[in-house]
């Protein structure tokens, strides 16, 4: 643990010395800092044990941050040229076929965690013609509440961002269902070329096994990556 006391003016020169023989078990390192006033000195003692602990702490913190960064990088680009959309998908998810979905990806060995995209023709040219982000969020949550399996549903957040030539609405909501318990849902929607694009990212968020921050950040990246392809 570092302790420091400055006397007089700012330190000008620092020297390193050892207070005990090199092979002493409790070797103490001393850093003597001489200020501009020779009579004002600062002595900082740091035991070898504390030094080792500090190094280990830095090492493991760096290791954990590195692992977290790697987990954030485990996303791959998926592009559907026929339907005109693109997004990032976690590498642990595999594509499956299901009626009603233009694209569906499920987590390996845990199909309840999934990412789905549905594309439908509409008459409107932009999403704001349908309503505000809050209006659309209310429609989504009311649709969830009408399901027999839904015990409770609540909107967590509502947002909006600029996509490729169109506005993208983003939503986060929480559902407690008889089918799989509590789930966290991230949704995004936009209209392009008279088509409604809807993304649903569903992940388990049970009290005994809550959604961890690293996974959440990855799923948010998926949400923010959902966009239309450039018109050719």
Curated annotation (Swiss-Prot):
GO terms for biological process: photosynthesis. It is found in: Plastid, Chloroplast thylakoid lumen. The keyword Chaperone does not apply. Its main location: plastid. Signal peptide: none annotated. Keywords: Chloroplast, Plastid, Thylakoid, Transit peptide. Coiled coil: none annotated. This is PsbP domain-containing protein 2, chloroplastic. It comes from Arabidopsis thaliana. The gene is PPD2.
């Amino acid at each position: 643990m570092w302790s420091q006391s400055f006397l007089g003016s700012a330190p000008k020169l620092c020297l390193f010395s050892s207070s005990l023989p090199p092979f002493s078990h409790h070797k103490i390192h001393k850093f003597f800092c001489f200020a501009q006033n020779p009579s004002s000195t600062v002595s900082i003692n740091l035991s070898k044990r504390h030094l080792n602990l500090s190094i280990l702490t830095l090492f493991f913190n760096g290791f954990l941050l590195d692992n977290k960064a790697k987990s954030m990088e485990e996303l791959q680009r998926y592009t559907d040229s026929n339907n005109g959309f693109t997004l990032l998908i976690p590498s642990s998810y595999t594509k499956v076929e299901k009626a009603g979905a233009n694209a569906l990806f499920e987590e390996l060995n845990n199909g309840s965690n999934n990412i789905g995209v549905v594309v439908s023709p509409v008459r409107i040219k932009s999403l704001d013609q349908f309503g505000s982000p809050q209006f659309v969020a209310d429609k989504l949550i009311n649709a969830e509440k009408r399901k027999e399996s839904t015990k409770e549903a609540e909107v967590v957040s509502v947002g909006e961002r600029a996509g490729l030539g169109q506005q993208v609405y983003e939503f986060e909501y929480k559902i407690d269902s008889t089918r799989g318990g509590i789930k966290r849902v991230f949704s995004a929607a936009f209209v392009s070329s008279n088509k409604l694009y809807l993304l649903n990212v569903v992940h388990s968020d049970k009290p005994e096994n809550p959604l961890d921050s690293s996974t959440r950040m990855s799923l948010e990246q998926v949400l923010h990556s959902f966009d239309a392809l450039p018109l050719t």
